[in-house]
């Protein structure tokens, strides 16, 4: 039985597109990429020869290339094995690409069901219409995302401030012109397997001679498949990794150095990062007050603890949470509200640069619209420079002025956003755009669903 089980496991891994199956059977999950892990999960689901598979968010947080492969795999397995599949997802593009029928749920109840063609082109329920309108457009740039106002569980509207008298106004008044971030010849290699002799080490060139510049006040996108090096570049700029060689300058100050001089510390204060997962990036044991106050206390930007609380209260109001959130813990908030806390923490040091590393990939489309609109408002009001990392190409089109495409640690194209999406010059850029999930498989959406005017 053991040998038969091994043989079946090998066959299952081959059926889901995993090569070198005998060796892979002995590997651990952390040794697989995200796409390969998802293939293994699909193989596990097939092991019992089921008639029905339930796929719960099977492509969430996967880049467009891996997402397309997983969806194609699910479709082909359904045809070959005559399987039924229930896809649970917040990605309407996935539904458009794979499903025959769809049921839309809100507040625990099914509010609309029907053929995918019918639901996408002529939805009848207000919630379905709002969801479809909130999907970022990959074919057209709009000023704002259409938000679903009754979704996010208590988030207040964005509150504009009087920058002439507000402490955040100091950020705008102090914003210099010119290049905010300059990267020149940046390299980073990770050692995957250590060995006594250098020739026996296994290494990965995560960042390969990357050079780029981002202007003050610009929103700059970084896209690429998983493992392309985009998040590593962000972490190098933020000082979370140390580069092997190359230069990183923040408003002209070289920060690609190990020592922490006063100038480097001051430059780092100008830059803050919003991480991908709002569920793991916040300390579960800290109250929101202490989470947001941490950079204020670290950089000593308040004269007293009373002033710290006043600043935290003000920031929470500003991002739409309200002062009542101060004494709560992260587990008491929804995903979108937690990401607002992350944004509040990033603003607390009065930065001039925000690095947003996949800030909405863990959120559904309705909450995503709220967070992206908030980031747009903050950038416009405070004059922030943004480095926006995402594998979601429609989000990049809506959020960024220019885009760099990364592959295997190197930049293969930098262009204005509209130019990249309309006339990409590099074959890999065109490949990514071709893989982008589209909602208009059955024709263009009605004008009422085409996004905000």
Which residues does each PLM region occupy?
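ABC ATPase NBD coupling module
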Residues: 2, 118-123, 196-201, 255-272, ...
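Conserved ABC ATPase "signature" region
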Residues: 4-23, 306-324, 433-434
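Short catalytic/signature loops enriched in Gly
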Residues: 19-22, 116-182, 193-198, 417-453
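A short, proline-enriched helix->beta-strand linker immediately N-terminal to the Walker B motif
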Residues: 47-51, 348-352
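A short, surface-exposed alpha-helical micro-motif characterized by mixed small hydrophobic
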Residues: 95-97, 396-398
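Conserved ABC transporter NBD signature motif
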Residues: 246-257
């Amino acid at each position: 039985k053991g040998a038969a089980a091994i043989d079946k496991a090998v066959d299952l891994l081959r059926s889901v597109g995993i090569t070198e199956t005998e060796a892979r059977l002995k590997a651990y999950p952390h040794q697989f990429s995200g796409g390969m892990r998802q293939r293994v999960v699909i193989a596990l689901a097939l092991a019992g020869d089921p008639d029905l598979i339930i796929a719960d968010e099977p492509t969430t947080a996967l880049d467009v290339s891996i997402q397309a492969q997983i969806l194609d795999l699910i479709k082909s397995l359904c045809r070959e094995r005559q399987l039924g599949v229930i896809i649970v997802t917040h990605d309407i593009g996935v539904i458009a690409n794979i499903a025959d029928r769809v049921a839309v749920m809100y507040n625990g109840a099914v509010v609309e069901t029907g053929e995918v063609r019918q639901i996408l082109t002529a939805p009848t329920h207000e919630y379905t219409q709002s969801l479809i309108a909130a999907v970022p457009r990959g074919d057209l740039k709009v000023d704002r995302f259409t938000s679903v106002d009754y979704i996010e569980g208590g988030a207040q509207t964005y509150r504009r401030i009087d920058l002439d008298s507000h402490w955040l106004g100091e950020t705008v008044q102090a914003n210099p012109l010119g290049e905010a971030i300059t990267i020149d010849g940046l390299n980073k290699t990770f050692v995957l397997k250590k060995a006594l002799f250098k020739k026996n080490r296994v290494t990965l060139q995560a960042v390969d001679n990357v050079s780029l510049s981002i202007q003050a006040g610009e929103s700059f996108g970084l896209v690429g498949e998983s493992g392309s090096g985009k998040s590593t570049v962000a972490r190098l700029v933020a000082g979370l990794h140390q580069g092997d060689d190359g230069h990183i300058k923040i408003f002209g100050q070289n920060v690609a150095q190990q020592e922490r001089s006063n100038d480097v510390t001051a430059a780092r204060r100008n830059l803050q990062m919003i991480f991908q997962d709002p569920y793991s990036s916040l300390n579960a044991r800290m109250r929101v007050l202490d989470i947001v106050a941490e950079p204020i206390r670290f950089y000593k930007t308040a004269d007293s603890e009373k002033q710290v609380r006043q600043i935290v209260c003000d920031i929470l109001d500003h991002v739409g949470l309200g002062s009542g959130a101060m004494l709560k813990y992260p587990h008491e908030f929804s995903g979108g509200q937690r990401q607002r806390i992350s944004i509040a923490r990033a603003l607390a040091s009065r930065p001039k640069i925000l690095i947003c590393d996949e800030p909405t990939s863990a959120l559904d489309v309705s909450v995503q619209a709220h967070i992206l609109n908030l980031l747009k408002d903050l950038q416009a009001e405070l004059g922030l420079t943004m480095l926006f990392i995402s594998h979601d190409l429609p989000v990049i089109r809506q959020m960024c002025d220019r885009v760099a495409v990364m592959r295997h640690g190197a930049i293969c194209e930098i262009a204005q956003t509209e130019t990249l999406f309309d006339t990409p010059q590099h074959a890999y850029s065109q490949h990514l755009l071709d893989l982008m999930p589209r909602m208009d498989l059955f024709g263009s959406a009605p004008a009422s669903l085409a996004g905000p005017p």
